[in-house]
């Protein structure tokens, strides 16, 4: 039987915390038209301006969370790759990053050289966005066309509402929910509003809605924010969370454009003003801990919350290589994958 490789796809990381490595990574990331959706000349100008100061600032942030083994995202993704092998009996399990190493191109060429003819992609993004899911899949298409690879490729679609994914989230978070706390904040990665408006053409679609109940199926399929709300609502129901004891926010905004709300930094101050002293934060848009969780929330967010008057902020780890997540990912990749 022809082997079917499972290719885990995530965003990526600099090779090291050196400023030049961070600059190279940021340049590749920000020059992606799915990330900064401006015409090439404007994008090049904007990114060049960003790269004057941002690499040194980001290098400092990466240094604060870097492990002896390397980038936390890469290390944790490698652990997931290893843990997945017993759950994917159809062929090898490989890992690639959209930016940085291991590059999608290198991994696909290696699979082709080894005689692999079937590949199942597993983009590790629960919710859909052009800047994550689409760009990863488009890079796979580009590599296959550029090298004329004879690969039959299928891909795991976004799984924001899949019961096995939600159950894995609940199981991984449950020990933290059993600790004394006042509130749970689900902080998702943010996105410029225009990224959603380009895809969801319905002018009545509400990007400030507090829940996903009235979202049409057509809008839900394309609206990252609505999918995040759907994940949060389903998680809260499964975890038995009381209304008012949890909320949703969006982090990591960049630049002056309007991003989806509410913003996490503003939400942290609001929760303190509401009397929340002990805060739990989970980041369900990420399946592996990275700079956005460990540094932005676990360090800067915690410092902000305590400085504003809170007593403690506990960052709940991402799914990483939790056994429930490993099993869920294997099951979904086999059951849900569709032709690319």
Swiss-Prot record:
Q: Does the keyword Iron-sulfur apply?
A: no
Q: Which family does it belong to?
A: Belongs to the ferrochelatase family.
Q: What phylogenetic lineage does the species belong to?
A: Bacteria, Pseudomonadati, Pseudomonadota, Gammaproteobacteria, Pseudomonadales
Q: What GO terms fall under cellular component here?
A: cytoplasm
Q: Specify the domain of life of the species encoding this protein.
A: Bacteria
Compartment(s): Cytoplasm
Select a single GO molecular function from the record's annotations and give it: ferrochelatase activity
| Functional note | Catalyzes the ferrous insertion into protoporphyrin IX.
Report what the protein is called.
Ferrochelatase
Look up and give the organism this protein is from: Pseudomonas aeruginosa (strain UCBPP-PA14)
Give a yes or no for keyword DNA repair in this entry: no
> What residue ranges are annotated as transmembrane?
none
